[in-house]
């Protein structure tokens, strides 16, 4: 059974992993990955950002600055206890991780289903971002009808664990502003980076993974594709591949 309660699983005193969840999500999205990494001997720290830390029918409004402040505080606490810190971001956790890596020393960076733009369907008249910054200004919350997980049993478990039944649009707009802040910094980010993206993602545009890969200044970077998963790949049909690739990357010598 999945839980949405933040946890610290301590192992090695040398290397800790900070796991960053997605917008409107929580620890449950990365719980199984965190447990796997702990079983492989790594220390794992998860958090629920401010505005994501209490159950509510409607997701409350929060800003990327609030989320990043929490990320930075946790990172700084970990640096007092561990020799090296790696960051694993999922969805909106990816631009947060990139923003952190642009200003602080990160051992390794893993980006799962990175949110750089919203998935555009051919039948949309305009990009989704255009709606968000126009008529979307009149609406605070929209229903979240179904979690983007193809694994039916895992989707049921995630539905039980999630805190919110809606998406807060002001928070989505704030996440897009964070992405605008991150893009100019990519060329200066030199940390070794693994990007894992599914071609079947129904939430974010999969080309965002290629954009990051091409723009990153790191000489050590890898883009790994999935072909059977939806957006929440750490809980989906190919989660074992995700776990193995992430652990292998974290353990590889630079």
Model-derived features: positions:
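Gly/Ala-rich beta-loop-alpha elbow adjacent to hydrolase catalytic centers
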Residues: 89-93, 97
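Short alpha-helix in the alpha/beta-hydrolase fold that links the catalytic acid
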Residues: 33, 191, 205-214
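The serine-hydrolase catalytic nucleophile loop
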Residues: 24-34
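Short beta-strand/loop motif that positions the catalytic acidic residue
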Residues: 189, 195-197, 201
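Catalytic active-site module of serine/aspartate enzymes centered on a nucleophile-bearing elbow/loop
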Residues: 227-254
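Catalytic histidine neighborhood in serine/cysteine hydrolases
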Residues: 210, 214-232
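Conserved alpha/beta-hydrolase
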Residues: 38-56
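Active-site nucleophile elbow and catalytic-triad environment of alpha/beta-hydrolase enzymes
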Residues: 168-185
